[in-house]
């Protein structure tokens, strides 16, 4: 009998909402030269092919910094930088063009592979490169001539859209021409950022050596707002980190996010499958830079009843929560606060006020199993406490059979039945024997 993989089935089912959401959207993928020379690059190419097969419109931007430095070293030349930007003289430009040209051919060849027994079998991907970008010189700064180092003058977004409409992957490198016919060396982060903005891309995706941005404890930060990302850039630059994939991408991601690109994702080029995990799972695997959080705490509406029921039913079946019917939920929905992530209800709690006694009950606290080790319960408690204070309540109580210590750690103390509102005392279930915990607001 063939072995069945329920993990594969569950993973595929969970990815379907993201497949549908991403289809027809434009993504700009930024590949630094470090990613291209890594042994995992073949897998990254396969995953790019997978995205294309799912109907995602792809613009791939590649850099060549380490390859250019190797070429310079082979000619006994030192790279020259001014204010952390490469100075590209005529000799260096030839080496830049050589490195960029070889990478373009290599990436195109890899994406064109459709041999049997390979992930791209039968893909038949068209890869298109061209003069989609017109450059101009950076000029002279503090007496230093950047020579053939340039910046973007304009982008022919209509031409790029035509290629994407014809189901091609657009491949763009770090060399662009000017209106005078000269060639200029551009930074891959500027190219990727400007393309994402001009094409109104849904996402910009970058690769670095780590799995994203980490905090001081070394834990991956799953989500950053532009201001926080800017602070992280400044911290890294203070330690002399100007050219890593993380810093270069974050610079671009901050600009892109502030210019209308909804999400920018930073993932590792060393991790096989990082691109797929980041885009087709609820929590991803790297760091995303966003203007608005993928997760929000808000009051529940009638449309949230299905999600709340799905969340609390397993806890009701285990006897952890008191059973609530759909009809009861419909009548009490205005009492509920939820945490929603990518249209999934991952946590909920209700506040039942007793205004005459200046006290409220926090009830029906539930957190999705995947998020119980995080701070969602704390977020709900803070929100419910805030709501209770706004109502003029002075105390908050809970009835619990399983989470006694959790509430005690947050300022609740054991209490007797007689502290409850009269109405609640009459309904107290002595068979269930829930512990009563009370906190001052």
From Swiss-Prot:
Locations listed in the record: Cytoplasm
PROSITE patterns: GNAT
Main location: cytoplasm
One GO cellular component term noted in the UniProt record for this chain: cytoplasm
A Pfam cross-reference name: Acetyltransf_1
UniProt entry keywords in alphabetical sequence: Acyltransferase, Amino-acid biosynthesis, Arginine biosynthesis, Cytoplasm, Transferase
Keyword Phosphoprotein carried by entry: no
Known catalytic reactions: L-glutamate + acetyl-CoA = N-acetyl-L-glutamate + CoA + H(+)
Gene3D superfamilies per UniProt: 3.40.630.30, Acetylglutamate kinase-like (3.40.1160.10)
UniProt superkingdom: Bacteria
GO MF terms held by the record: L-glutamate N-acetyltransferase activity
Biological process per Gene Ontology, one example term: L-arginine biosynthetic process
Alphabetized SUPFAM superfamilies for the sequence: Acyl-CoA N-acyltransferases (Nat), Carbamate kinase-like
Domain N-acetyltransferase: 295-434
Stored InterPro entries: AceGlu_kinase-like_sf, Acyl_CoA_acyltransferase, Asp/Glu/Uridylate_kinase, GNAT_dom, NAGS_kin, NH2A_AcTrfase
UniProt key word Zinc: no
EC number annotated for this UniProt entry: 2.3.1.1
Biological pathway: Amino-acid biosynthesis; L-arginine biosynthesis; N(2)-acetyl-L-ornithine from L-glutamate: step 1/4
Subunit field text: Homohexamer.
Record family assignment: Belongs to the acetyltransferase family. ArgA subfamily.
NCBIfam families listed in its UniProt record: N-Ac-Glu-synth, PRK05279.1
Name of protein: Amino-acid acetyltransferase
Organism of origin: Serratia proteamaculans (strain 568)
Gene: argA
């Amino acid at each position: 009998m063939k072995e069945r993989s329920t993990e594969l089935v569950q993973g595929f089912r969970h990815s379907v909402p993201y497949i549908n959401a991403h289809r027809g959207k434009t993504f700009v993928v930024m590949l630094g030269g470090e990613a291209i020379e890594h042994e995992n690059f073949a897998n990254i190419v396969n995953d790019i092919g997978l995205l294309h097969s799912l109907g995602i419109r792809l613009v791939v931007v590649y850099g060549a910094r380490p390859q250019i430095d190797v070429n310079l070293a082979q000619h006994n030349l030192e790279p020259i930088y001014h204010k952390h930007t490469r100075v590209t003289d005529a000799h260096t430009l030839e080496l830049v063009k050589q490195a960029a040209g070889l990478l373009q051919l290599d990436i195109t060849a890899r994406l064109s592979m459709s041999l049997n027994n390979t992930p791209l079998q039968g893909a038949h991907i068209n890869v298109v490169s061209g003069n989609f970008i017109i450059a101009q010189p950076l000029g002279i700064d503090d007496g230093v001539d950047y020579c053939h180092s340039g910046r973007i003058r304009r982008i022919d977004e209509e031409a790029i859209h035509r290629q994407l409409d014809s189901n091609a992957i657009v491949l763009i490198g770090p060399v662009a021409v000017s209106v005078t016919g000269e060639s200029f060396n551009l930074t891959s982060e500027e190219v990727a950022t400007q393309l994402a903005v001009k094409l109104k891309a849904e996402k910009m995706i970058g690769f670095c050596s780590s799995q994203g941005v980490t905090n001081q404890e070394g834990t991956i930060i799953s989500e950053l707002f532009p201001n926080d990302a800017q602070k992280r850039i400044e911290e890294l630059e203070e330690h002399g980190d100007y050219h890593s994939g993380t810093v270069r991408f974050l610079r671009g991601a901050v600009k892109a996010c502030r210019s209308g690109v909804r999400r920018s994702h930073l993932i590792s080029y060393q991790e096989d499958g990082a691109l797929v995990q980041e885009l087709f799972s609820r929590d991803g695997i790297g760091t995303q830079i966003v203007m608005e959080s993928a997760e929000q705490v808000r009051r529940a509406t009638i449309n949230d009843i299905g999600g709340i029921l799905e969340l609390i039913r397993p806890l009701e079946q285990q006897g952890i929560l008191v059973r609530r019917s759909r009809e009861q939920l419909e009548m009490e929905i205005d009492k509920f606060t939820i945490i929603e992530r990518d249209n999934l209800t991952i946590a909920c709690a209700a506040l039942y006020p007793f205004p005459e006694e200046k006290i409220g009950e926090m009830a029906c606290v539930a957190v999705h199993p995947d998020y119980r080790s995080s701070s969602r319960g704390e977020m709900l408690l803070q929100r419910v406490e805030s709501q209770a204070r706004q109502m003029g309540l002075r105390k908050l109580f809970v009835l619990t059979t399983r989470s006694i210590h959790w509430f005690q750690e947050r300022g609740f103390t054991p209490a007797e039945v007689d502290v409850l509102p009269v109405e609640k005392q009459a309904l107290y279930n002595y068979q269930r024997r829930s512990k009563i915990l009370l906190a001052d607001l």
